[in-house]
UniProtKB/Swiss-Prot annotation:
Protein name per the record: Demethyllactenocin mycarosyltransferase
UniProt keyword annotation of Repeat present: no
Region spans: Disordered: 1-21
GO molecular function: hexosyltransferase activity; UDP-glycosyltransferase activity
Amino acid sequence: MAGLRPGAGVPPGTPWPISPGKHCVRSAISRRARLPYHAPGTPLGRFRRAPDEGSCRMAHIAFFILPAAGHVNPTLGVAEELAARGHRVTYALPEDMADRAVRVGARAVTYPLDRERFRADMVPKEESDEYTDEGEFLKVLEWLLDTTADTLPLLESAFAEDRPDVVANDPSTFWTGLLLAGKWDIPVIRSTPSYASNEHWALHPPFEPGAAQVDPALIELTARAEKLLKEHGTTSDPVAFAATVQSGPGLFYMPRYFQYAGETFDDRHHFVGPCAPRASFHGTWQRPEDGRPLVMVSLGTIYNERPGIFRACVEAFRDRPWNILLVLGGGLGAGDLGPLPENVLVRDFVPLGDVLPHTDLLVNHGGTSTAMEALAHGVPIVAMPEMPEPRATARRIAELDLGDWLLPGEVTAEKLSGIAQRVLTDDRIRKGLDRMRGEIRRAGGPAVAADVIEGLLSPAA
């Protein structure tokens, strides 16, 4: 299986909108062999080497990202840009996501992941705005520690002959990337698809269980964390170590304008906007030729098994002269939705980069990554958020006149039809979308994100 070069599949002569990079210096790295990538479909531990793509040996950047689509996808355009500049990029990912890295010109080293446990333990529950339940917090901490312990020796071995020069680390994920960066004494940059937090605004207030209520299991997990950190040569204080996750420079995949209290964040916070890749990994898409407006409905890839909501969307728009695209996200099947009118199209997944330029309205779960891509194309949004972060995004969409929102429990065909009609005809929303597109353009996207990462590289000795 050949690794794809940046630009694979792009028609000859198509210009790449890529800057040469304001920090294009060779880092002080040896000319080591390229890190083998794990070819999807081969057993764990068996690697195939990417074909030699030339003699350029600039820097090696490793991405350690929470293994969820809403965290991995926002980074792919940055990886694609870095690869196009001649850098080597490697992702640490589970097997089922490795192909995304390969398609943007990166490589992947894989680790085992129990998807059922990940979904059960790591996704905040829809009825809670924060980790106020100690049992929920304990499950998150236990998953983090278990996954760090399981992946650290595997990934340290995989990178042993080709250490990276910079680690891009998702603050939401396990600690392996941070611990390895500390061992290797290399820079770390946060890679954050969600909001920044400071003393002025935070999505999740810190979880602070009262001393009289501390579960013995929390004491045990804290001791495990101390032992793990000590074994790997860093502070044995988990609280102090966790604080480093939110310190230092960071990439945030939204414009500063969309960030709550955006003006209060210092220049360590780089709000680069959405960084969608040019490469596609969900096939191709062509808009129906009947000329009708297109409404796309998506509930993401987590809480998407909601046939009642999909049916409400169908009923809301079935008599309109519109095409309705239902994107099921791998949860339900078309048969779960009952009979559908002729203007309804059903897909499991779609390439957003192909669909959004032709979309007139997005009805979705409020996922920040998808919302940013839609807004980059000037598409208004009606959000139906389940979880804390999407609720924050839905509220921000309404505040900035980019669309509207309602809770899933409030969704009816009548309400949805009325909100959609208003969103599509409101001049304030059209003006809000125009401003947002300008803010996204000024944020700079993948080129600026790559510049920031290159700024962390050490000049050649």
